[in-house]
From Swiss-Prot:
Signal peptide extent: none
Domain of life: Bacteria
Name of the protein this chain belongs to: RNA polymerase sigma factor RpoH
Function statement: Sigma factors are initiation factors that promote the attachment of RNA polymerase to specific initiation sites and are then released. This sigma factor is involved in regulation of expression of heat shock genes.
Subunit structure: Interacts with the RNA polymerase core enzyme.
Family: Belongs to the sigma-70 factor family. RpoH subfamily.
Residue positions of motif Interaction with polymerase core subunit RpoC: 77-80
UniProt xrefs under Pfam families: Sigma70_r1_2, Sigma70_r2, Sigma70_r4
Molecular-function GO term, any one: sigma factor activity
GO biological process: DNA-templated transcription initiation; response to heat
NCBIfam families: PRK06596.1, rpoH_proteo, sigma70-ECF
Residue ranges flagged as DNA-binding region: 255-274
Organism (species): Rhizobium radiobacter (Agrobacterium tumefaciens)
Coiled coil: none
Length: 300
């Protein structure tokens, strides 16, 4: 997309460290500068402008890519796929819409990386059932949320909690955890430039991006809400009421209360809840898959 080449990652930890050092040299853009560069590329196809937009966001790609280290794939390839998503985002970026490129690009980056993971992981590793796929993409996040130490097998109470949250069996949780175990910790030591040492999480911290990170997080939350609201359109009135009462309320309504409200058994309420969740999840996944496929569409 640009005449200027991007830094490349060579194999091994040393190669990754060199890459991180290189991309830190690219300056971050002020909002007005980003706007003008976006205009130059959108209106005139200015490749130098596009190159500056891409290089100024390579750190964002690296940050996102680090979150996918637990899938057993070469981090260099994960970063490269994220860079493909970033370049697609730059091609589609419209500065007149009023939001920053980072906010827009993060979705393209994540979609590109996730599509690469889906292509790369064998069905033997990932599994073919809906439960296995649900675990594949949610287990690591839930382990972090409940502060489960990732040093081997999960504690029984953690297995039970994850199984309940994802509506899967405890045996499936244990099996998938063993398949995915071995991801690198953000506390793992790395050797930085000029003889300095530190941890992965130290590199990820950048005070200059703190305000932008907050804005990105807010935008991500709002986007998730919009996606959920759209996905819930597939539910009928009863399914929607039960789904909201059981899954979205701060204090979930009991099966007993809902069974009285609809004059049906508690087991029937539970079945409707599970089915509604599956329908919403399927709708969200369909939208995400369509977004991922769009990444492969190259403008003529």
């Amino acid at each position: 997309m640009a005449r200027n080449s991007l830094p490349t990652i060579t194999a091994g930890e040393a190669g990754l460290n060199r890459y991180l050092d290189e991309i830190r040299k690219f300056p971050m853009l002020e909002p007005q500068e980003e706007y003008m560069l976006g205009k130059r590329y959108a209106e005139h196809g200015d490749r130098d402008a596009a190159h500056k937009l891409v290089t100024s966001h390579l750190r964002l790609v690296a940050k996102i890519a680090m979150g996918y280290r637990g899938y057993g794939l070469p981090i260099g390839e994960v970063v490269s796929e994220g860079n493909v998503g970033l370049m697609q985002a730059v091609k589609k970026f419209d500065p007149e819409r009023g939001f920053r490129l980072a906010t827009y690009a993060m979705w393209w980056i994540k979609a590109s990386i996730q599509e690469y993971i889906l292509r790369s992981w064998s069905l033997v590793k990932m599994g073919t059932t809906a439960n296995q796929k649900r675990l594949f993409f949610n287990l690591r996040r839930l382990k972090g949320r409940i502060q489960a130490i990732d040093d081997g097998d999960l504690k029984p109470e953690h297995v039970k909690e994850i199984a309940t949250k994802l509506q899967v069996s405890e045996e499936e949780v244990i099996s998938m955890n063993r398949r995915l175990h071995g991801d690198a910790s953000l506390n793992a030591p790395i050797k930085a430039s000029e003889g300095e040492s530190g941890q992965w999480q130290d590199w990820l911290v950048d005070d200059h991006e703190s305000q932008e990170a907050v804005l990105i997080e807010q935008d991500e939350l709002e986007t998730r809400r919009r996606m959920l609201a759209k996905a819930m359109g597939v539910l009928n009135d009863r399914e929607r009421r039960i789904f909201e009462a059981r899954r979205l309320a701060e204090d979930p309504v009991t099966l007993e209360e809902l069974s009285s409200e609809f004059d049906i058994s508690r087991e029937r309420v539970r079945q409707i809840e599970v089915r509604a969740f599956e329908k919403v999840q399927e709708a969200v996944q369909k939208e995400a898959l369509e977004a991922a496929r769009a990444l492969r569409v190259v403008d003529a």
